[in-house]
Amino acid sequence: MSSQTAPRRRVTIHELRRMKDAGEKIAVVTAYDATAARLADAAGVDVVLVGDSLGMVVQGHESTLPVTLEHMIYHSAAVRRGLARSSGRAHLVGDMPFGSYQASADEAVKSAMRLVAEGGVESVKLEGGAEFVEVIRRIARAGVPVMGHIGLTPQAVHRMGGYVVQGKDSEKAQQLLRDARALELAGCYAIVLECIPAELARIISSQLRIPTIGIGAGLHCDGQVLVLNDLLGMDDAFTPKFVKRFGEIGQAISTAVGAYVGEVKRRVFPDDAHSFHSSTVRLVPAAPVDEDDGEPSGGVMGAPV
């Protein structure tokens, strides 16, 4: 019997469905660059999402609205390269940003196909409920799997009046359940449930055949998603209720950079261990360049031979 570890099964949309049926929880991480993707994949995440949240986390905007399709393609391609440097097991999903699918189904299909062809994603995610059923059908018919996203949908932040929990009353909860069913019938292979009551998320998850991925939606979703920067504790100022910090990397980074600055200022870094040396290099006089004619005009030590 071989002592080598068998390769982990590549996560596909069919594998995610199998995981739901088997009661196996799905771990999703949002990442934006090659290094983060490589580390997340090596840690065993099932899905890496390149989220349009990069507008806030990476670009420093107040919302996701300024993010363009070009931005999403750029970051998706970087994440794809990172996954290629690891096991490449994780399924890669790319967000469809604001303005890339709302205008028409034709535009949506083109946007989705670009994310696949140029960004290297295996599926796309879009926000919205039953009003996007035809868009989802068209994208799916074009051969691109679609992950839905209901509840708090950040691209609709102005309509929602801010980043607030959705579905807290019976009428709105019923609408979210209808939306979830409509997205499943339209062809979504999974749905993100963001910032809705845990009780509602449990009902939706139990009534759908496709996996639900929760963020701020309680324990009973089929999977969970967090932004890598958030779960690592990169930003002390961002502390939403649904984020658990599994590390305090932000403080560790500040400490490490502070130590670097201190050693530079004290002339401690770089030491011999971090410098290159040669016993054969010697310098001979080199004439400086005359400012008038550009010709050497005197002796200056500095030309290696």
UniProtKB/Swiss-Prot annotation:
<dbReference type="GO" id="GO:0015940">
    <property type="term" value="P:pantothenate biosynthetic process"/>
</dbReference>
<feature type="binding site">
    <location>
        <position position="95"/>
    </location>
    <ligand>
        <name>3-methyl-2-oxobutanoate</name>
    </ligand>
</feature>
<protein>
    <recommendedName>
        <fullName>3-methyl-2-oxobutanoate hydroxymethyltransferase</fullName>
        <ecNumber>2.1.2.11</ecNumber>
    </recommendedName>
</protein>
<keyword id="KW-0808">Transferase</keyword>
<feature type="binding site">
    <location>
        <position position="127"/>
    </location>
    <ligand>
        <name>Mg(2+)</name>
    </ligand>
</feature>
<keyword id="KW-0963">Cytoplasm</keyword>
<keyword id="KW-0460">Magnesium</keyword>
<comment type="pathway">
    <text>Cofactor biosynthesis; (R)-pantothenate biosynthesis; (R)-pantoate from 3-methyl-2-oxobutanoate: step 1/2.</text>
</comment>
<feature type="binding site">
    <location>
        <begin position="52"/>
        <end position="53"/>
    </location>
    <ligand>
        <name>3-methyl-2-oxobutanoate</name>
    </ligand>
</feature>
<comment type="function">
    <text>Catalyzes the reversible reaction in which hydroxymethyl group from 5,10-methylenetetrahydrofolate is transferred onto alpha-ketoisovalerate to form ketopantoate.</text>
</comment>
<comment type="subunit">
    <text>Homodecamer; pentamer of dimers.</text>
</comment>
<feature type="binding site">
    <location>
        <position position="125"/>
    </location>
    <ligand>
        <name>3-methyl-2-oxobutanoate</name>
    </ligand>
</feature>
<keyword id="KW-0479">Metal-binding</keyword>
<dbReference type="Pfam" id="PF02548">
    <property type="entry name" value="Pantoate_transf"/>
</dbReference>
<dbReference type="InterPro" id="IPR015813">
    <property type="entry name" value="Pyrv/PenolPyrv_kinase-like_dom"/>
</dbReference>
<feature type="binding site">
    <location>
        <position position="52"/>
    </location>
    <ligand>
        <name>Mg(2+)</name>
    </ligand>
</feature>
<keyword id="KW-0566">Pantothenate biosynthesis</keyword>
<dbReference type="GO" id="GO:0000287">
    <property type="term" value="F:magnesium ion binding"/>
</dbReference>
<feature type="active site" description="Proton acceptor">
    <location>
        <position position="194"/>
    </location>
</feature>
<dbReference type="GO" id="GO:0003864">
    <property type="term" value="F:3-methyl-2-oxobutanoate hydroxymethyltransferase activity"/>
</dbReference>
<feature type="binding site">
    <location>
        <position position="95"/>
    </location>
    <ligand>
        <name>Mg(2+)</name>
    </ligand>
</feature>
<comment type="similarity">
    <text>Belongs to the PanB family.</text>
</comment>
<dbReference type="InterPro" id="IPR003700">
    <property type="entry name" value="Pantoate_hydroxy_MeTrfase"/>
</dbReference>
<dbReference type="InterPro" id="IPR040442">
    <property type="entry name" value="Pyrv_kinase-like_dom_sf"/>
</dbReference>
<dbReference type="GO" id="GO:0005737">
    <property type="term" value="C:cytoplasm"/>
</dbReference>
